[in-house]
């Protein structure tokens, strides 16, 4: 997909850069694989804000994506490539030879009419889903399971991928885009190729309103608040906050490690930092 740049007809279009979606499906999603979602605005069941900077955004339908690829040994044909407002990657509607439909993450260079399959004996082609045990070393993969059978959890955003580095003692060493190298069970499955919409990183929204459509509200700096609202608030005139950066609840931020799951740390061969 190419990038789409607009002429400066208005000030809000002057900086806009979007991904050209002219080749995508222009109709509605498949009805039985889509459902409505209720926006919470970042509030919990008590009506209190638990996640800052969340708003309503535009009304959306949630597309039910098959991250597990559990229909084995049956070929599927790519019917169309679609835009999904709930994620940065594009999605593909596939039709299995037995007549069932499913949505999957669309890999890069997957085209309408292509045949894909989820099988232990599948070829190493873009869109095919296989166990890590049978994927050759050096292959680019995405939608990787951390726990066998749980469904893909890693490398699902637009343009992302991981590389299979090594296999040893029942585990595969996978290198992520962050630089982290992690051991994952050879029984876990992954899809060959990288995720579509690689130009997503080059998008420029051009105006605040376009970001509001996505459900994001403005972010206010702590030093611009009052002391009752933030540890950096208050002071006469403009101040720097007078202390090291902290969260609104006084916890150190900007560089402080927040990882809690010590049990799985043993699977990390090389940390991203």
From Swiss-Prot:
Keyword hit for Ribonucleoprotein: yes
Identify the Gene3D superfamilies for this entry.
Answer: 2.30.30.30, Nucleic acid-binding proteins, Ribosomal protein L2, domain 3
Question: Which intervals carry biased composition (Basic residues)?
Answer: 251-260
One function term, GO molecular function aspect: rRNA binding
One cellular component term (GO) for this entry is:
large ribosomal subunit
> Which chain regions cross the lipid bilayer?
none
Q: Which UniProt keyword terms apply here?
A: Ribonucleoprotein, Ribosomal protein, RNA-binding, rRNA-binding
Job of this protein? One of the primary rRNA binding proteins. Required for association of the 30S and 50S subunits to form the 70S ribosome, for tRNA binding and peptide bond formation. It has been suggested to have peptidyltransferase activity; this is somewhat controversial. Makes several contacts with the 16S rRNA in the 70S ribosome.
Q: Which family does it belong to?
A: Belongs to the universal ribosomal protein uL2 family.
Q: What is this protein called?
A: Large ribosomal subunit protein uL2
Upper lineage = Bacteria, Pseudomonadati, Pseudomonadota, Alphaproteobacteria, Rickettsiales
The gene for this chain is rplB
């Amino acid at each position: 997909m190419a990038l789409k740049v607009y002429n400066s007809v208005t000030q809000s279009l002057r900086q806009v850069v979007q991904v050209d979606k002219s080749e995508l499906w222009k109709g509605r999603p498949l009805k039985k694989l889509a459902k409505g979602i209720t926006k919470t605005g970042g509030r919990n069941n008590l009506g209190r804000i638990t996640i800052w900077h969340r708003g309503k955004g535009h009304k959306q339908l949630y597309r039910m994506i098959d991250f597990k690829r559990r229909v084995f040994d049956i070929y599927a044909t790519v019917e169309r490539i679609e835009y999904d407002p709930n994620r940065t990657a594009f999605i593909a509607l596939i039709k299995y030879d037995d007549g069932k439909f499913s949505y999957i993450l669309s890999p890069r260079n997957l085209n309408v009419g292509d045949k894909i399959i989820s099988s232990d004996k599948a070829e190493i082609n873009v869109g095919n889903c296989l166990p890590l045990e049978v994927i050759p070393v050096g292959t680019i993969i995405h939608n990787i399971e951390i726990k066998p059978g749980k469904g893909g959890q890693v490398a699902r955003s637009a343009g992302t991928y991981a590389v299979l580095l090594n296999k040893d003692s029942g585990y595969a060493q996978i290198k992520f885009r962050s630089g982290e190298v992690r051991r994952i069970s050879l029984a876990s499955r992954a899809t060959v190729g990288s995720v579509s919409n690689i130009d997503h990183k080059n998008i420029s929204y051009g105006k605040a309103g376009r970001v509001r459509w996505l459900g994001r509200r403005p972010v206010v700096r702590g030093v611009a608040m009052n002391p009752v609202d933030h540890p950096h608030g208050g002071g006469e005139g403009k101040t720097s906050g007078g202390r090291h950066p902290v969260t609104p609840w006084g916890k150190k931020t900007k560089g402080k490690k927040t990882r809690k799951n010590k049990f799985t740390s043993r699977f990390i061969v090389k940390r991203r930092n």
